[in-house]
């Protein structure tokens, strides 16, 4: 399919928010990723989309330390309401550092570090994700133009650099609470996330 990913399977996926088609993709190293689609996404019109990085703690365990779970739910609801769209779910836990390192970083955050300081203290990158994987998925699905649900300007730039036309950025401000207030502020202050619109 592309130099980054191969499409390996698709199936129907009924969820709390409606029925999606789930597409499975695999990197050469065996790492798996999925995309959830609704409707005809390859008709040339801009497609509502979210690039979501795996977050076991937020997506599956309902942690209040981040806004990931509420963002995923809001994106799934928005795509269903639109009647067409795609959610790219990249298996890049903990901004790409992995689950165990994320737990280590959480421990350092409990001692007063913010999310960026904790990653650096562990000798890890602040953000190790590769959003080019999303471009490979869009390519397979025939998507060239998107309306992107994101607060992260890096996702926008990566898609533009890959030749995807980002016609609109749609802010995704959900899941704020007292437990993740500092985390969200750090994302704005140190990672450039667009949190105030």
Curated annotation (Swiss-Prot):
Similarity comment text for this entry: Belongs to the GTP cyclohydrolase II family.
GO biological process: riboflavin biosynthetic process
Keywords: GTP-binding, Hydrolase, Metal-binding, Nucleotide-binding, Riboflavin biosynthesis, Zinc
CDD domains referenced in this protein's UniProt entry, alphabetically: GTP_cyclohydro2
Organism: Neisseria gonorrhoeae (strain ATCC 700825 / FA 1090)
Gene3D superfamilies from the UniProt entry: GTP cyclohydrolase II (3.40.50.10990)
Cofactor(s) needed by this chain: Zn(2+)
Known EC number: 3.5.4.25
Enzyme class: hydrolase
Protein name: GTP cyclohydrolase-2
Pathway annotation from the record: Cofactor biosynthesis; riboflavin biosynthesis; 5-amino-6-(D-ribitylamino)uracil from GTP: step 1/4
Residues that, per the record, bind GTP: 50-54, 71, 93-95, 115, 150, 155
Positions annotated to bind Zn(2+): 55, 66, 68
Alphabetized PANTHER family for the sequence: 3,4-DIHYDROXY-2-BUTANONE 4-PHOSPHATE SYNTHASE (PTHR21327:SF18), GTP CYCLOHYDROLASE II-RELATED (PTHR21327)
Lineage: Bacteria, Pseudomonadati, Pseudomonadota, Betaproteobacteria, Neisseriales
Recorded superkingdom: Bacteria
List of catalytic residues: 127 (proton acceptor), 129 (nucleophile)
Role summary: Catalyzes the conversion of GTP to 2,5-diamino-6-ribosylamino-4(3H)-pyrimidinone 5'-phosphate (DARP), formate and pyrophosphate.
Cofactor note: Binds 1 zinc ion per subunit.
């Amino acid at each position: 399919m592309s130099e980054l990913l191969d499409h390996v399977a698709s199936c129907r996926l009924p969820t709390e928010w409606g029925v999606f088609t789930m597409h499975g993709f695999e990197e050469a190293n065996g790492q798996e990723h999925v995309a959830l689609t609704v409707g005809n996404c390859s008709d040339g019109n801009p497609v509502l989309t979210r690039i979501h990085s795996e977050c076991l703690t937020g997506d599956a365990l309902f942690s209040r330390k981040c806004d990931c779970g509420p963002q995923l739910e809001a994106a799934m609801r928005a795509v269903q309401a639109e009647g067409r769209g795609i959610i790219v779910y990249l298996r890049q836990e903990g901004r790409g550092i992995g689950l165990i390192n994320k737990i280590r970083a959480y421990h350092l955050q409990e001692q007063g570090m913010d999310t960026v300081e904790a990653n650096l203290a562990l000798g890890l990158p602040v953000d190790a994700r590769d959003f080019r994987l999303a471009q490979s998925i869009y390519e397979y699905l025939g998507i060239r133009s998107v309306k992107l649900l994101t607060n992260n300007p890096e996702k926008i730039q990566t898609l533009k650099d890959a030749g995807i036309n980002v016609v609109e950025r749609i802010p995704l401000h959900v899941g704020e609470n007292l437990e993740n207030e500092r985390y969200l502020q750090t994302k704005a202050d140190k990672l450039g996330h667009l949190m105030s619109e």
